[in-house]
């Protein structure tokens, strides 16, 4: 008989499940399929009434295209939501957008110029809405399980009104107050900033040692003695109104050449080296409290200022005498208030000096350092000038330096709710304890929350001032009236109507005015737990999951707002991920020139491979993107797909039915049950990288062992043989497990696989299926197979030696004389399991036997020749062509 006859007699099937994925085409096909059949909506209807699981989406900013960090974040969330949904939970996912703030406002001002606030707001609102639509179209390409018709955004009247209800609650609890305080001020944004809006970057500052002349001395210091002062902000010397000393620190009066100087005793040696003093003399030694009240001449203007006590004075740097400019530093401010020091403000909103700066008026603050230094040099007041590179606060939007500047601002007291915040944090679940400490530090140790901003595009601070310019905070009916207007017309009403038109009738025509500031944008997004209206579900929600920068941002503001409004955290569990970095560990961004467009990646690789890269990343650290790493994930995908294709192809004639299994089939079945349990455990812990690794390792092990030994049964046994059906039963079990296991990570491929699976009660989509439950598996049975694998390794070492010496070509040519006294080993089909021609047992040693048997032309196994084919193939062929095989 010819080769084709034998080949055609084998159980070889074709499959429409292609080896090539063509993911870009299939992504669109299945996205349309899910939308057309309203799969998300069907899932929610099916799960309604079940235990709920809510992952609340932190809103990205509605400006520009999505970047790779956005894609990473949304995919991680989607994997969780898909898994929880398949695990039986009611898990609606409502995407949100953050719409107010400086980037949009600046963009509009650059387009239309300095128009009215109303025009800026109208254009900003239109722009934000257009950006939401653009980003939405891009997010859809990530195959997210959601309904983009059901979203939340911070610029809708309903959201804005709820935000203001929370603000009213803060006011009613006495947490909101107005104060003149130094705050972070951004000249580039011309607005106050909260700590959450500060980014620390490298910056070069002058390191200046100058001197102030004492006007009138006492028993320890004399007129014209020089106080040594150190500063890195010479521009603040204009606003100097005092010098602070440590009351209990030791100070010295020293003479160098013709001058007398005062400085901290502990810093004398260090400063003498810096100033190159060779022959100084210590005249006196005294505690700081001995010179309190001593007056000195201002370094620039003709006025007298005092020496006062300061708890913040340090002996780590400087001279032990600290120049005070009360409106340009927090410590300076409180010391200034306590000692009634003059509060000088010489810097305008744009960072330029006003008339209080005298001859320096009109200069930009940073440029004035050089001019002021030159001025002091002419007066022989410079002891030393150098420059230092150090970490310095910058505006996180413009990346320009910020300053501390005293302005009247609105604050929310954190001090009053610290115990409530600490209690709420104790109830939150963290994957690692250090993350709990991180949130605690950033929330509980923060200063009072600066909530006012001097901008146009945001939610107005709905506060009125009476005829005496005092804020009216004790009239809840006024807040209720405004909130009802905002709920109906949106926050624009605050700018469209006059003050009297915004007030209830009894408060009209009293000469009141309204506040012009807006609320911090972190206040906007930080009320989403309350304002987003997530399928009528109420907090606390199960998970908040954002980038690690949100500990100071959204996690922070959301917690504060929720504790104030509800008395508890808005989230039960907190997860965070790192930033996407390049192969060198640099954060990816367009500004650095190393950014990568996620849409380009999607177009090249398809969504499932992009999602696989996300799942296969240790997201709790920074995530490395490189072509090499992506190709590794392509290989993992290919391995999964090829395995699935093999399973589908070899199940073409299988009708799902339970079979009693052989020892080895039972072993594999139990391994599959163990696989299921490990997958569930790692999905439950949100360890997706472990899910991918477990699946990949199982496939490698399964292919190397089980598929190697059962291909012969699948292809060459009778189609209906029990052995073949037992193998197919395992293949079917694994196919179902893989299909469900990869569905949260690779929804397109999972849906495609599902279309090839035969089963009863099949759903319209794999994503409507239930995730498999944890299964019992026989640990003892699995463990006892370790003995077989030890024997297999030792036998194959001997076989490899034979192959290497070219005595044989393949393992199936040889016999094995096996030394063992194990009943288990003797009971299993070793010829199949070791893929050798023959196994016999020995009491002496294990060795390889060269048999010189014939190779069966049908199955290629080696056999003792009786017929043209081996006994098994003879039996199979006899049913096809009786009496023609002998």
From Swiss-Prot:
The gene is ileS. One of its GO terms (cellular component) is cytosol. L-isoleucyl-5'-AMP binds at residue 546. A motif ('HIGH' region) lies at residues 60-70. Belongs to the class-I aminoacyl-tRNA synthetase family. IleS type 1 subfamily. ATP binds at residue 590. PROSITE patterns: AA_TRNA_LIGASE_I. Zn(2+) binds at residues 856, 859, 870, 873. This is Isoleucine--tRNA ligase.
């Amino acid at each position: 008989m010819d080769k084709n006859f034998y080949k055609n007699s084998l159980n070889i099937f074709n499959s429409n499940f292609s080896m090539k994925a063509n993911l870009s085409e299939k992504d669109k096909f299945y996205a349309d399929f899910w939308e057309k059949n309203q799969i998300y909506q069907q899932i929610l209807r099916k799960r309604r009434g079940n235990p709920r699981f809510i992952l609340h989406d932190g809103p990205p900013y509605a400006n520009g295209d999505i970047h790779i960090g956005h894609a990473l974040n949304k995919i991680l969330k989607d994997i969780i939501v898909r898994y929880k949904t398949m695990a039986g939970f009611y898990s609606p996912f409502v995407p949100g957008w953050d719409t107010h703030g400086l980037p949009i406002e600046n963009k509009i001002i650059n387009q239309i110029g300095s128009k009215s606030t109303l025009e800026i707001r109208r254009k900003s609102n239109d722009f934000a809405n257009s950006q939401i639509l653009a980003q939405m179209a891009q997010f859809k390409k990530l195959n997210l399980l959601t309904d983009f018709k059901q979203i939340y955004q911070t610029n809708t009247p309903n959201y804005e009104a709820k935000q203001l209800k929370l603000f009213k609650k803060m006011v009613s609890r006495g947490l909101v107050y107005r104060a003149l305080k130094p705050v972070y001020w951004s000249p580039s944004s011309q607005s106050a900033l909260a700590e959450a809006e500060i980014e620390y970057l490298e910056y070069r500052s002058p390191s200046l040692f100058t001197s102030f002349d004492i006007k009138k001395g006492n028993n320890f210091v004399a007129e014209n003695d020089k106080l040594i002062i150190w500063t890195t902000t010479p521009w603040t010397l204009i606003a100097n109104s005092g010098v602070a000393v440590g009351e209990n620190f030791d100070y010295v009066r020293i003479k160098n050449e013709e001058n007398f100087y005062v400085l901290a005793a502990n810093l004398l040696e260090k400063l003498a080296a810096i100033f190159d003093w060779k022959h100084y003399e210590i005249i006196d030694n005294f505690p700081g409290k001995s010179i309190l009240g001593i007056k000195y001449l201002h370094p620039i203007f003709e006025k007298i200022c005092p020496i006062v006590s300061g708890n913040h004075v340090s002996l780590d740097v400087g001279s032990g005498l600290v120049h005070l400019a009360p409106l340009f530093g927090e410590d300076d401010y409180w010391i200034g208030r306590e000692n009634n020091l003059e509060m000088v403000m010489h810097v305008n909103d744009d960072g330029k000096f006003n008339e209080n700066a005298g001859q320096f008026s009109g200069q930009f603050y940073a440029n004035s350092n050089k001019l002021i230094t030159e001025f002091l040099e002419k007066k022989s007041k410079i002891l030393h000038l150098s420059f230092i590179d150090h970490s310095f606060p910058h505006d996180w939007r413009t990346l320009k330096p910020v300053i501390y500047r005293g302005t009247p601002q609105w604050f929310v007291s954190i001090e009053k709710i610290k115990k409530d915040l600490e209690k709420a944090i104790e109830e939150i679940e963290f994957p690692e304890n250090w993350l709990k400490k991180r949130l605690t530090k950033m929330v509980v140790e923060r200063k009072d929350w600066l909530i006012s901003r001097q901008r146009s595009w945001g939610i107005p601070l709905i506060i009125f001032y009476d005829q005496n310019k005092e804020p009216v905070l004790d009239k809840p009916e006024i807040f209720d009236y405004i909130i009802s207007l905002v709920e109906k017309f949106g926050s624009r009403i605050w700018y469209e109507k006059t003050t009297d038109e915004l007030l209830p009738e009894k408060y009209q025509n009293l000469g009141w005015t309204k506040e012009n500031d807006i609320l911090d944008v972190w206040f906007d997004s930080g009320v989403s737990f309350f304002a987003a209206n997530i399928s009528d579900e109420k907090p606390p929600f199960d998970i908040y999951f954002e980038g690690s920068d949100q500990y100071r941002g959204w996690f922070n503001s959301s917690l504060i707002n929720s504790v104030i409004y509800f008395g508890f955290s808005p989230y039960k569990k907190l997860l965070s991920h790192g930033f996407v970095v390049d192969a060198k560990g640099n954060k990816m961004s367009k500004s650095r020139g190393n950014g990568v467009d996620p849409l380009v990646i999607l177009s090249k690789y398809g969504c499932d491979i992009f999602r696989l890269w996300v799942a296969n990343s240790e997201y709790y650290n920074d995530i490395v993107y490189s072509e090499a790493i992506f190709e590794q994930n392509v290989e993992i995908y290919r391995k999964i797909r090829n395995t699935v294709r093999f399973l589908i192809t070899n199940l073409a004639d299988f009708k799902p039915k339970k079979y009693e299994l052989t020892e080895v089939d039972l072993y594999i079945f139990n391994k599959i049950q163990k696989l299921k349990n490990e997958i569930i455990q790692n999905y439950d812990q949100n360890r997706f990288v472990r899910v991918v690794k477990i699946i990949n390792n199982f496939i490698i092990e399964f292919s190397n062992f089980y598929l190697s030994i059962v291909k012969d049964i699948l292809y060459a046994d009778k189609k209906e043989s029990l052995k073949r059906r037992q193998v197919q039963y395992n293949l079917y079990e694994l196919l179902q497990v893989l299909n469900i296991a990869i569905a949260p990570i690779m929804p397109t491929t999972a849906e495609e696989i599902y279309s090839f699976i035969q089963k009863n009660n099949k759903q319209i989509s794999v994503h409507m299926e239930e995730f498999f439950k944890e299964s019992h598996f026989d640990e003892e049975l699995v463990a006892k197979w370790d003995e077989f694998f030890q024997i297999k390794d030792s036998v194959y070492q001997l076989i490899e030696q034979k192959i290497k010496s070219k005595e044989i070509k393949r393992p199936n040519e040889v016999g094995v004389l096996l030394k063992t006294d194990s009943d288990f080993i003797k009971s299993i089909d070793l010829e199949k399991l070791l893929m050798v021609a023959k196994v016999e047992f020995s009491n002496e040693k294990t060795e390889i036997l060269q048999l010189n048997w014939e190779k069966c032309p049908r199955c290629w196994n080696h056999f003792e020749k009786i017929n043209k084919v081996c006994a098994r193939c003879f039996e199979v062929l006899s049913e096809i062509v009786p009496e023609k095989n002998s």
